[in-house]
């Protein structure tokens, strides 16, 4: 049987590591690019858009649909990087603790 005090210490350690990982993620920026850098989006580790840069060549009425597509692609690129980094950070924070199948961390 697992020692309860040992389990409690392990849980507290995991909580501290998770908190540190969340703080690190919140301070990290992810850049997504599309159209060969015609559109660039920077998001925070919380998935919030911080900045959008659009090449002037796309600021024409006839380029509206392409611009919309490029913004979507750039955002998804940045979000994917953020999500991958988040998973890697959390894996390190959990450091060998097994979670139940399907358990997902809420950020």
Curated annotation (Swiss-Prot):
Show the GO MF annotations. Answer: DNA binding
Say yes or no: keyword DNA-binding present: yes
Q: Report any Pfam family annotated for this entry.
A: YbaB_DNA_bd
Signal sequence interval, chain numbering: none
Which UniProt keyword terms apply here?
A: Cytoplasm, DNA-binding
InterPro entries given in the database record: YbaB-like_sf, YbaB/EbfC
Tagged with keyword DNA-binding: yes
Q: Where in the cell is it found?
A: Cytoplasm, Nucleoid
Checking Gene3D superfamilies in the record gives: Nucleoid-associated protein YbaB-like domain
Q: Which SUPFAM superfamilies match?
A: YbaB-like (SSF82607)
Any single GO CC term annotated in Swiss-Prot or TrEMBL for this entry = bacterial nucleoid
* Assembly behavior: Homodimer.
Q: What does this protein do?
A: Binds to DNA and alters its conformation. May be involved in regulation of gene expression, nucleoid organization and DNA protection.
As for family, the record states: Belongs to the YbaB/EbfC family.
Q: Per its record, how is this protein called by name?
A: Nucleoid-associated protein RP866
